[in-house]
Every structure is written in C-alpha cells, then in structure tokens.
C-alpha cells in the first residue's frame, strides 16, 4: 500500500506504548492542520485507507501506523518517512523463537529507509541502540534518563538537544512514567 501514496508515513512499533504513541502523534498532526489517518494494527487497514486516498486525493495528509512484528513478516518494500521505536521487551517469543529474531523482525520496518528518513528510538533500551546503528536514516534518540540527546526529560520539562524546554511535564495529562516516554517518542 505504501507504493500507492505520496503522503508521509510515520510507523510506530515497540513492545509497549504503540497505540498511545500513535494517538499522541495523530493529535500533534491535527494541531498543525495536517489530517492524520491512523491505521495498521488498529482500525481500518492501511491498504483500505490508501485506496480511499486514491479515489479522493487529499493534501496535508499523513499516515500514522501502528506496526506489529507480525505485520513485518510479509513486508517487502515498506518505507516510512519516520519510524518510531518505543521499546523492546521479550514479547511474542512463542512466534519468533528468540529475542534476536524478534528484534530483527522489528527492524524490517526500517530496512528500506534511506538518508531522507528518520528513526526515532528509545535510547534507554540498549538493544535498540545497537539495532539501529549503521542505518542510513537519521537517528533521533530520546531518553527518560540520559541528557544530551535529541529529546530528554528532567523533573520539570521535556527538553530538546540544546536543553531548551519543549513541554512542561505538568502539561501532560497522561499519568505514569511510561507515558512520558511515549511523549518523548
């Protein structure tokens, strides 16, 4: 389906936090007057959304996709503009066998990305740091504990690489540290 759209694709994957992150990104797009369409592992399939776009072209459209490891098993040419990795933990090992196989399946999402793409990843996850190294896409790390990355957090704010506050922690309505991590992504 990605072959048939020129609209940017943001693909979100990870063991936890995918749905929340997709919803946050969709709201961010809407606030910038970009129509976002959520699809993938939730709601109407991405392919059906693209078919609708072909029949009724729209401008200022972005696809925000929730991607599971299962969906990556059959993908040949998928190439998002932005790939987001929330975290990786030993899930679905009954299907993938080992953690290495699970990580490799998650990496299928970025194998076709070039240097015009972005990989946003949780730099608190050592497996993700190793997994994304060497990709042509630009790496955009975020962290709940490390500073000096593209996005980090302190007791008061989500900060940019330059240390400038981007958003106050108090302004985030979602409770829990895991949701702060989702916001960073």
Regions found by a protein language model. Name each.
Residues 1-123, 127-136:
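Phosphate-binding loop of NTP-binding sites
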């Amino acid at each position: 389906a990605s072959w048939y759209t020129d609209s940017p694709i943001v693909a979100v994957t990870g063991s936890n936090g995918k749905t929340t992150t997709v919803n946050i990104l969709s709201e961010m797009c809407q606030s910038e007057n970009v129509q976002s369409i959520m699809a993938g592992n939730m709601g109407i399939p991405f392919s059906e959304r693209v078919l609708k776009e072909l029949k009724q072209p729209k401008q200022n459209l972005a696809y925000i996709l929730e991607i599971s490891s299962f969906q990556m098993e059959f993908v040949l040419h998928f190439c998002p503009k932005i790939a987001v990795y929330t975290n990786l933990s030993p899930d679905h090992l009954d299907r993938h066998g080992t953690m290495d196989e699970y990580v490799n399946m998650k990496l299928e999402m970025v194998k076709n990305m070039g240097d015009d793409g972005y990989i946003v990843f949780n730099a608190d996850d050592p497996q993700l740091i190793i997994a994304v190294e060497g990709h042509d896409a630009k790496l955009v790390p975020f962290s709940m504990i490390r500073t000096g990355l593209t996005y980090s957090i302190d007791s008061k704010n989500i900060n940019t690489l330059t240390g400038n506050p981007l958003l106050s922690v108090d302004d985030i309505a979602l409770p829990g540290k895991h949701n702060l991590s989702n916001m960073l992504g």
